[in-house]
């Protein structure tokens, strides 16, 4: 059916070393998106929020980059959303209707860049959802119904090379 999406996005990054030499290699960043996604199909659900479309999403964090190392701490959030066109608040037993609560997740990552002498090999170790917050996310199947448990605390190893 017909929908209308309007909103705004903003992002910023600031190198704190510009404030004081003691803060060299330290930067902060943030991004934010507001989306007003409404159903525009005539009928009982006209004007309701489009399912699985949170109004607010964002991220923020801090990077510290001394030499070849990078240390990062970040947070990601999103507001609540609905699982159906009717914007039903109460959750059904199968999760196909109801409000999906918003959530906030924290992550951290440490990386080392070996530089051009090793083909710019970069190795990183990180953790997503540090506090193992239980949350729900939307389904990604073809019928677009239901909830899935969000990713639990996850430790990861990452590598990249330029060649």
For the regions a language model picked out, list residue spans one by one.
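Outer-membrane beta-barrel pore domains
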Residues: 16, 98, 108-112, 161
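Extracytoplasmic gating/loop element in the C-terminal half of outer-membrane beta-barrel translocons
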Residues: 74-76, 83-89, 93-100, 107
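Surface-exposed coil/turn segments at beta-strand junctions on protein surfaces, enriched
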Residues: 21, 53, 64, 99-101, ...
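Glycine-rich, flexible loop segments associated with nucleotide phosphate handling
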Residues: 23-31, 95-101, 119-126
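Extracellular loop and loop/strand-boundary signature of outer-membrane beta-barrel proteins
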Residues: 42-49, 92-98, 142-147
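Gram-negative outer-membrane beta-barrel transporters
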Residues: 1-86, 160
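Residues that define the transmembrane beta-barrel architecture of outer-membrane proteins
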Residues: 4-8, 54-58, 102-106, 119, ...
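C-terminal beta-signal and adjacent terminal beta-strands/loops
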Residues: 79-87, 112-163
């Amino acid at each position: 059916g017909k929908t209308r999406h309007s909103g705004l996005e903003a992002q910023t990054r600031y190198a704190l070393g510009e404030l004081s030499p003691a803060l060299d290699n330290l930067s902060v960043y943030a991004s934010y998106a507001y989306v007003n996604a409404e159903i525009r199909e005539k009928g009982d659900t006209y004007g309701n929020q489009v399912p699985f479309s949170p109004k607010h999403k964002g991220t923020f964090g801090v990077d510290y980059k001394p030499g070849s190392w990078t240390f990062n701490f970040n947070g990601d959030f999103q507001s609540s959303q609905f699982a159906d066109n009717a914007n039903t608040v109460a959750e059904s037993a199968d999760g196909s209707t109801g409000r999906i609560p918003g959530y906030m997740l924290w992550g951290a990552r440490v990386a080392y860049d070996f530089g051009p002498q090793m083909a710019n090999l970069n190795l990183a170790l990180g953790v997503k959802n540090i506090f193992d917050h239980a949350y729900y996310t939307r389904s990604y199947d073809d019928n677009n119904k239901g909830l899935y448990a969000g990713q639990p605390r996850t430790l990861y190893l990452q590598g990249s090379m330029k060649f």
